[in-house]
């Protein structure tokens, strides 16, 4: 404030001297002494004006306002220069602020639009980009992502048929391992029944339940995907089921034949046992004469 007050006082004194000399010159012809006096006053006036402008830009709003008023009261040209520079700086700051705020708003708007751009429909549709399935993280943002999702759906349905095939093979193994026909001695006498223990039965049934749980989960996910009514998804659900059954479902024909053979074997063993019991009963029956 001391520098600014001193500059203001010096500038005021210079203006008083300049006004006095101009008043004297207006009453008579301009002489050489008046011109030399004006030339001596102009350089200090320009220096003080520049210093006042720099001080006004670096100080607070009140100081800058007083600096602007002081400069406007000195010389029209210097006031215009300082006003223009202040206006330019404020215009640049306002432009930068506006650009920054608009950029931030545009970014936020774009992010919000991208986060809420999932296309959902309760009718038949063929959406590819911006389609969402089951969760918000499964958001299709490109064609490559959509193709990868389609292949994932196909492999999921093929894996379902593979699990079903695994359960059938496990059931066949259990039948072969613990079937009464496999433990019978048809040619030496009555069949010997040696079934699995209770703990083994519980363990085997637990494994079969795990197979069933996996099938149920995959089938439920397939149902949820189909509920989006996307034509591509439903089409490739069918394709995955077809390819899966084509690769892993060929055993169903032989299963029926093997089951009928096993049934005939069990019936044959039962008939032989019945005949054996009948022969023993006839041997022990006393004959009457």
Swiss-Prot record:
Subcellular location: Membrane
Cytoplasmic side: 164-232
Record key words, sorted: Copper, Copper transport, Ion transport, Membrane, Phosphoprotein, Transmembrane, Transmembrane helix, Transport
GO BP annotations listed: copper ion import across plasma membrane
One Pfam family from the record: Ctr
InterPro entries: Cop_transporter
GO CC list: plasma membrane
Listed GO MF terms: copper ion transmembrane transporter activity
Induction or repression: By copper deprivation, and repressed by copper sufficiency.
Membrane topology label: Multi-pass membrane protein
Modified residues (Phosphoserine): 279
Extracellular side: 1-142, 254-289
Superkingdom of the organism of origin: Eukaryota
Family: Belongs to the copper transporter (Ctr) (TC 1.A.56) family. SLC31A subfamily.
Subunit structure: Interacts with ctr5.
Function: Required for high affinity copper (probably reduced Cu I) transport into the cell.
PANTHER family linked to this entry: COPPER TRANSPORT PROTEIN CTR3, SOLUTE CARRIER FAMILY 31 COPPER TRANSPORTERS
Protein name (record): Copper transport protein ctr4
High-level lineage: Eukaryota, Fungi, Dikarya, Ascomycota, Taphrinomycotina
